[in-house]
């Protein structure tokens, strides 16, 4: 993933040459140094945690202390002496939005970016497609079998079974999967433009309606999700993808399980909506509802 950022910066040096840059959540300062190497005049590297001290050491060791200014503090609290030409960050979490760093990225834009300035990355796209995987479904189901016992040292546990089942199926499955599990060659996308999206209207609640025609007769066990981000530079467009069709990344992919699988025949259609609602745990609640068109069959 780091290499993709380096490529995006180096292939768009015109966007960095003699420009003022903000790095949101700089961490150890790698992206700030990439911006300096691409010719930036000044880079404000902002980091809320104590790792900012490591970033300062790294910047000095690489001879860029005159260019890269490491500032420890939250974006909300930091004041800069000038507006900036480009904002860089690695704000993506699982399913793009987990950790809620996108809101900080967008807040920095509202606070410091010049009207004609750029966001790197520029857009993020969530992809969804129904999948079939009986093995993972059985695995989750079996994880609650402990609560099937009617005589656990004289105690009947079955009353707690449904709650345990609900909790097991409420957890997203984070990991890699084969694209052969997808039941459609098409996917539904939701694009977030970091240059225009607002913290409140665009990121607090994300609604993704969908409709899919099955390419094969199958059992739908849930919804598979992944994302990409694109860097729309003046000289080149660079994409970082977490797709199951692309090389693995540390963001993996996500799968959301239905409690009741849906049997579907080739050419039948399922439709519904996936809703992501921001919560106080720096993440999102995800609600998924799916219906087999032309029937009363539905699941969530």
Question: What is each stretch, according to the model?
Answer:
Residues 1-24, 28-300:
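Class I SAM-binding transferase module
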